[in-house]
């Protein structure tokens, strides 16, 4: 099994966390990819309106895909630096692997940008979880962990270089036939680690202010709880066939 974490070293707290977490849950065999988007602007398309942070994130994912291809891995688990993997992640992945086909992506964590519907028709059961197709590709959002096949990795590398789309623009990648099928695992087996401060560079004055403020900490904790609850209620499951249920392999 191949596991690659996306984490820029300049975000020290997050980088240290995911390194410890993967050593504990996954084992010693993993990689960490992190590209600083503030010095990688040349790699973004002139027509892109992405922020430097989004460019760096996208480039980090592309670097992970290159590693998957170079190592000739059939698939890989890509994790964000705030992911919390379950203790049985290896068992889950063995069962996910049995369902994979060329060009597949499987989100083990999904934060839809809005209320989204997913189909239970022909959903694949994996223990207490189900693999479901979206009713619309826009229902697929940011993901703290996802499985990607080598063919999908190759497709996204072709579609997003130079970088024009954020790392989690699944609809964009599907439209360009970079991904042939995308499913979500429900409920999410992967959760999010709550950090004391928002995503700001190490050494940032704003980061130090937020992290050191006792008044702001309860607000941040409440905000995280609100977002988690909102995410849990954003997915609706319907007994209707997904329009993406007959997608052909690449």
Model-assigned labels for residue ranges:
Residues 1-79, 83-250:
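An acidic/histidine-cluster motif and surrounding catalytic segment
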């Amino acid at each position: 099994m191949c596991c690659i974490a996306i984490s820029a070293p300049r975000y020290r707290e997050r980088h240290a966390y995911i390194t410890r977490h993967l050593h504990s849950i996954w084992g010693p065999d993993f990689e960490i990819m992190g590209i600083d988007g503030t010095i990688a602007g040349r790699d973004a398309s002139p027509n892109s309106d992405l922020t430097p942070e989004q460019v760096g994130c996208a480039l980090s994912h592309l670097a992970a895909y290159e590693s998957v291809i170079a190592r000739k891995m059939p698939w890989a688990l890509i994790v964000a630096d705030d992911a919390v993997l379950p203790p049985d992640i290896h068992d889950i992945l063995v069962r996910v692997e049995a369902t994979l086909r060329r060009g597949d992506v499987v989100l083990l964590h999904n934060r839809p940008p809005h209320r989204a519907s997913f189909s239970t028709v022909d959903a694949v059961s994996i223990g207490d979880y189900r693999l479901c197709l979206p009713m619309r590709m826009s229902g697929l959002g940011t993901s703290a962990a996802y499985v990607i096949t080598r063919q999908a990795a190759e497709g996204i590398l072709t579609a997003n270089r130079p970088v024009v789309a954020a790392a989690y623009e699944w609809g964009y990648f599907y439209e360009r036939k970079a991904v042939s099928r995308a499913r979500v695992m429900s409920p999410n087996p992967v959760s999010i680690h709550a950090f004391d401060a928002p995503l700001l560079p190490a050494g940032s004055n704003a980061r130090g202010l937020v992290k050191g403020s006792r008044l702001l900490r309860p607000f941040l904790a409440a905000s995280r709880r609100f977002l988690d609850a909102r995410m849990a209620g954003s997915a609706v499951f319907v007994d209707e066939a997904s329009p993406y249920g007959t997608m052909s392999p690449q």
